[in-house]
């Protein structure tokens, strides 16, 4: 089997634009008629004025495919990945921008391989470990109004079947590490107290701060919130300095989580080996793809760390994350962010029910685009 062509599609998302304002899909075609589906994570595309802002991303996909993909056997995933990873000007030290291109291509290749074998991808990577995947919700707006309101929202999520959620007690996002005042820490503690009073120990609650705290502020926050038994403390400091994150981890019993901004097994290995985090939030669409994610999960497994993949993306990469989760023994929980288009763009939607995701059983990614829906949103 040979890869003959790669086509891209830009699809406009629907409000509230979960995963970005636009989705960038790939179709990898073969001489045997099998087509693999991939997706290039577009990052902060909700800030884009139009799809034309992504022309450079589209060009990079086609440039990479012309050089390393077209004419190759789609089963040679490792070879294709290594050649593309090591042959650009940023030789073996790529940016998040380029690893998301590698991820998009790699996911499409796995979709082809799974379809050719008539097996879901997870069956080709060790087989199904989990029949269902625990998922968590991002707490809706309004939780900062009062501790009582935070408790009401958490209780509603619990009654909907969710066993875990996440919130950022220190918005808005700040461009650099900042001090958190004692007043802000106290307000956050009251929010967590309100949640615990409402749901008891029936729901896990994660702290997500987007890496915007100084080291000492992160330690103060952790000490103040420990009594409420948070699920994790996500990116307490920026992932740029692994040693500082490890210092936070050493000063708290709250598990530290990180990974959505890290790429390849090399960056993750340092975080894991230095004890900077014990919950690894890799992003399949950005870290290098499904096989690279499986390698990262294996490194984490050797240190008794768990994976809780990041999912702020379009529906194709969400499907790829589900394939990884299903075959990973150290899977903990999956972020579950879905907008209206995620639920209608496939002929058979991904199944999210009662706080769990049910892995698809079809070949490859187990999904098929509904082209009527795609064409209604197609912009390029």
Annotate each PLM feature:
Residues 1-37, 41-48, 339-343:
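Structured beta-strand/loop patches that form or line metal/cofactor-binding pockets in enzymes
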Residues 3, 33, 65, 105, ...:
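Conserved, mostly hydrophobic/aromatic
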Residues 29, 63, 93, 223, ...:
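Shared catalytic-loop signature of beta/alpha-barrel
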Residues 29-116:
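Metal- or metallocofactor-binding catalytic centers and their adjacent structured scaffolds
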Residues 96, 106-143:
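Glycine-rich, aromatic-flanked loop segments that form ligand/cofactor-binding clefts
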Residues 102, 184, 207-214, 234-237, ...:
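Glycine- and other small-residue-rich loops at beta-strand/loop junctions that grip anionic moieties
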Residues 132, 136, 140-251:
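Metal-dependent enolase-superfamily TIM-barrel catalytic cores that perform enediolate-based chemistry
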Residues 340, 345-380:
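C-terminal extensions of enzymes
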């Amino acid at each position: 089997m040979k890869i003959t062509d790669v086509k891209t599609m830009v699809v406009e998302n629907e409000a509230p634009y979960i995963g970005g304002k636009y989705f960038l899909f790939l179709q990898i075609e073969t001489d045997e008629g099998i087509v693999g589906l991939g997706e290039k994570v577009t990052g902060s595309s909700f800030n884009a004025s139009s799809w034309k802002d992504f022309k450079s991303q589209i060009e990079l996909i086609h440039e990479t495919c012309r050089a390393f993909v077209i004419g190759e056997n789609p089963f040679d995933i490792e070879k294709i990945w290594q050649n593309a990873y090591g042959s650009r000007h940023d030789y073996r030290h790529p940016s998040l921008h380029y690893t998301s291109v590698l991820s998009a291509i790699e996911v499409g290749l796995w979709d082809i391989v799974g379809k050719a074998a008539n097996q879901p991808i997870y069956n080709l990577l060790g087989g199904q470990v989990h029949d269902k995947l625990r998922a968590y919700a991002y707490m809706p707006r309004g939780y900062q109004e009062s501790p009582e309101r935070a408790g009401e929202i958490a209780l509603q999520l619990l009654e909907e079947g969710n066993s875990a959620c996440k919130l950022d007690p220190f918005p808005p996002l700040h461009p650099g590490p900042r001090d958190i005042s004692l007043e802000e820490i106290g307000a956050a503690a009251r929010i967590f107290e309100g949640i615990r009073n409402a749901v008891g120990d029936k729901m896990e609650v994660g702290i997500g701060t987007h890496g915007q705290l100084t080291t000492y502020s992160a330690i103060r926050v952790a000490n103040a919130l420990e009594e409420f038994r948070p699920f994790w403390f996500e990116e307490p400091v920026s992932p740029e300095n692994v040693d500082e994150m490890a210092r936070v981890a050493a000063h708290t019993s709250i598990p530290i989580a990180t990974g959505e901004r890290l790429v390849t097994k090399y960056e993750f290995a340092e975080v894991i080996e230095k004890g900077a985090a014990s919950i690894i939030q890799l992003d399949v669409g950005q870290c290098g793809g499904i096989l690279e994610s499986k390698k990262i999960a294996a490194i984490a497994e050797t240190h008794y760390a768990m994976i809780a993949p990041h999912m702020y993306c379009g529906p194709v990469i969400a499907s790829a994350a589900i394939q990884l989760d299903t075959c990973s023994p150290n899977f903990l929980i999956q972020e579950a962010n879905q907008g209206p288009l995620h639920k209608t763009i496939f002929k058979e939607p991904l199944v999210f029910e009662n706080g769990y995701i049910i892995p698809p059983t079809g070949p490859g990614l187990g999904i098929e685009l509904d082209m009527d829906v795609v064409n209604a949103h197609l912009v390029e």
